[in-house]
Amino acid sequence: MARLKITQTKSYIGSKQNHRDTLRSLGLKRLNDSVVKEDRPEFRGMVHTVRHLVTVEEVD
């Protein structure tokens, strides 16, 4: 199964509270933090919510 490397590239300062909560639930705490998650619809939805704050790469 494919995996996603999610990196926070922009600050959440000034963002809505639900965007901050989504970043926290993805495991991103500060700028340039990266996490690797399973490629599942739940994580795709979270990434879609904060797509303006993160970059996503597929990792094998």
Curated annotation (Swiss-Prot):
One Gene Ontology cellular component annotation held by this UniProt entry: cytosolic large ribosomal subunit
Phylogenetic classification of the source organism: Bacteria, Bacillati, Actinomycetota, Actinomycetes, Kitasatosporales
Protein family: Belongs to the universal ribosomal protein uL30 family.
Coiled-coil zones: none
GO BP field: translation
Species this protein is from: Streptomyces griseus subsp. griseus (strain JCM 4626 / CBS 651.72 / NBRC 13350 / KCC S-0626 / ISP 5235)
GO MF term set: structural constituent of ribosome
Entry-linked SUPFAM superfamilies: Ribosomal protein L30p/L7e
InterPro entries, per the entry: Ribo_uL30_ferredoxin-like_sf, Ribosomal_uL30_bac-type, Ribosomal_uL30_ferredoxin-like
Family matches, as Pfam families: Ribosomal_L30 (PF00327)
Keyword annotations: Ribonucleoprotein, Ribosomal protein
Keyword Ion transport: no
Protein name (record): Large ribosomal subunit protein uL30
Quaternary structure, from the entry: Part of the 50S ribosomal subunit.
